[in-house]
Amino acid sequence: MTLNPLVQFDIKKLIEIKIFGFDISFTNSSIYMLLASILALTYFYLAFYNWKLVPSRLQVSAEIVYNLVADMLNQNIGAKGHKFIPLFFSLFIFILFCNLLGMTPYSFTVTSHIIVTFALAILVFLTITIVGFVKHSLRFLTLFLPHGTPLWLAPLMIVIELFTYLARPISLSLRLAANMMAGHVLLKVIASFTISLMIYLKFISIPLMVILIGFEIFIAVLQAYIFTILSCMYLNDAINLH
């Protein structure tokens, strides 16, 4: 693992399960997604089960996260977005805990795999599309023709806008997976060099690793935020036809 920084992303079967020829084996990826969900639920249960008017530090931290997501929806969509707070709050928390869990030694970074991030992105994409059609019916299709487009340019613009719309889940998932993978590969490579140089540069190598880990934690939080706020912007397009 020290020599190959990509080994940390290998998916390993722990319990092999096949149903009608479909492989639905329980893997290390499954464990870390389940663990991230359990940790998130435990965190918010402990934060809110004994809610107080004068909040504890844990309650304050949970309220900050909730208000962050609520503000995202309020700023992008307005009052119409309040009903979607549970969805986007769950999305943000799941990605955040998966990212942070991947920072622990010898763990597995679930969000470095495109299949996981694409599943999240396609869930958001389908939800937003359904919301658009339910709210606007066939008028939702006007999203693909910008207002004021000349008639002769309409066919080309429809194709471009449709392609852009369909590319959203791809770009959303690739951005998250690529950033998480790149960050962990870089951290692994530098960590390998740091171990080799500790004999000669121990006063530099250890602080360098601490700085890099801190930066990677920042990236983990930032990527969860970016994924969620872009999803909010896409929902705004569907609701307000922007």
Swiss-Prot record:
GO terms for molecular function: proton-transporting ATP synthase activity, rotational mechanism. It holds the Pfam family ATP-synt_A. It is a multi-pass membrane protein. Keywords: ATP synthesis, Cell inner membrane, Cell membrane, CF(0), Hydrogen ion transport, Ion transport, Membrane, Transmembrane, Transmembrane helix, Transport. It comes from the Bacteria. The chain crosses the membrane at residues 31-51, 84-104, 114-134, 140-160, 189-209, 210-230. GO terms for cellular component: plasma membrane; proton-transporting ATP synthase complex. Its main location: membrane. It is found in: Cell inner membrane. Belongs to the ATPase A chain family. HAMAP family: ATP_synth_a_bact. Key component of the proton channel; it plays a direct role in the translocation of protons across the membrane. F-type ATPases have 2 components, CF(1) - the catalytic core - and CF(0) - the membrane proton channel. CF(1) has five subunits: alpha(3), beta(3), gamma(1), delta(1), epsilon(1). CF(0) has three main subunits: a(1), b(2) and c(9-12). The alpha and beta chains form an alternating ring which encloses part of the gamma chain. CF(1) is attached to CF(0) by a central stalk formed by the gamma and epsilon chains, while a peripheral stalk is formed by the delta and b chains. This is ATP synthase subunit a. The lineage of its organism: Bacteria, Pseudomonadati, Pseudomonadota, Alphaproteobacteria, Rickettsiales. The gene is atpB.
